[in-house]
Structures are given as C-alpha cells and as structure tokens.
C-alpha cells in the first residue's frame, strides 16, 4: 500500500512541475503512467531485498526529470523528446551560457510530492519483513524477492518494447504540437510512444534488394531527364 501511494506522489512529483492542469489529462494515460512508475518501484524494492532506498532514488530521479522538463519547456516551449537525448551536451553548453534558472511554485510543489513519495518508500522498507529465522526460510525469502523483482522489471521492459503504443493503445504524439500530447497523455506514455515511432515497423513484403532496385530505377529516370533538358 505504501508503494502504491508512493507511485502516486512520484508521478505528481514528475508531472506537476510542467503539467499542473490535470483537468484535460486523459485518465487512462495517467493510470498507465502510474502503473509503470509503481511497478518499477515495486521491482526495485524487492530487488534490493525490501529496502526503501532504491524506489526512493527512482522517485527523486523522476523529480529531476520533471524539473528538466520544466526548464526545457520554459526555454523552447517544447517537451523533452527521444531525439533530444543525442544533443544533451549541446543543450547543456547553451543553457550554461547566460541562461537564468528560476523555478516556479509548481516546482516547489513537485518537490513536496517527491519528498512524500520518498518517505513512503522508506516507511515501506521499515515495516516490511527483512529476515526469516533459519537458513531455508532466509533463502526462500531471497528467491521470492528476486522473483518478484524480475517479474516487475521484466514486465515493464516487455510492456514498453512489445506493445505498440501508437497502434494498440492509441497514444499519439502530434508532430506540430507535441507539448499538448505530453500534457494530455502524460510524460512517460508520450515519450515511449515517440521513442517507438523512431524506428517504424518493417512492412511484411519489404525486401532490401527490391528497395535498391527501385532506387536505381528512379535514379536512372532522373539521369535521363537531365540529359533531355
């Protein structure tokens, strides 16, 4: 229960900095985002043998992501998209040259939500049983923790890699107004959908040889048109 609530506050800690009007957010998208965050928290919790530090670090990392999103939106009125990750060094150099970093009240509110999430994670670690009497019981608990962690972390990995967010879930990032998509659908679902669209699926009848032949055909036709001119 503590981790379920921690997932809610971690989500708020990430989103509220830049997306504080939840009246137009799609409920199912936010529910999906909460499920992803909470499952990751549970997986880390059991991976580190029921200690709350790991999910607390995740909550803080999401807060940092939300603050970065706030600054990027303030700077260029666009969200952080998958393609931006290849230009982090350039963005940091530009931002460090005369750019004034000032936070808003919503950033402070996000900080409060993140603090609550981290406290809930630590409390979950305090109330959870850590040791069992006897070597057999201790080994059983260790294996159980690792199994739950693998199921949670592996489940999230399989979910974001195997499920087509665009065609199956209908989560669309509009090219001309991506910020609206991120605000309406939640940062993580929109980011995952955008990342999946970078590499489009290969058509069933696609052939490299046919593609090369088509290119040569068009190149030859273009060369002939130049000769006639």
Residue ranges and their predicted role:
Residues 1-176:
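Transmembrane and membrane-interface helices of multi-pass
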Residues 23, 224-225:
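Short low-polarity hydrophobic stretches
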Residues 155-223:
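Membrane-interface segments at or immediately adjacent to transmembrane helices
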Residues 227-229:
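Conserved small/polar residues in nucleotide/adenosyl-binding loops
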């Amino acid at each position: 229960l503590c981790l379920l609530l921690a997932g809610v506050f971690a989500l708020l800690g990430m989103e509220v900095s830049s997306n504080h009007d939840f009246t137009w957010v799609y409920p199912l998208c936010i529910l999906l985002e909460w499920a992803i965050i909470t499952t990751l928290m549970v997986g880390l919790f059991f991976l580190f043998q029921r200690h709350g530090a790991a999910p607390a670090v995740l909550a803080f990392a999401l807060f940092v992501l939300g603050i970065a999103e706030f600054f990027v939106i303030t700077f260029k009125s666009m969200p952080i998209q998958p393609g931006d990750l290849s230009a982090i060094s350039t963005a940091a150099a530009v931002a460090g040259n005369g750019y004034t970093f000032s936070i808003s009240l919503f950033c402070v509110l996000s900080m409060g939500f993140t603090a609550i999430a981290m406290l809930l994670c630590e409390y979950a670690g305090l109330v959870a049983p850590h040791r069992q009497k006897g070597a057999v019981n201790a080994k059983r608990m260790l294996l159980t923790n690792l199994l739950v962690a693998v199921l949670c972390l592996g489940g999230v990995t399989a979910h974001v890699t195997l499920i087509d967010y665009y065609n199956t879930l209908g989560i669309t990032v509009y090219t001309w107004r991506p910020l609206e998509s991120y605000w309406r659908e939640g940062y993580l679902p929109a980011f995952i959908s955008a990342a999946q669209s970078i590499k489009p699926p290969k058509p069933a009848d696609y052939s490299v040889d046919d593609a090369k032949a088509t290119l040569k055909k068009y190149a030859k036709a273009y060369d002939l048109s130049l000769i006639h001119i």
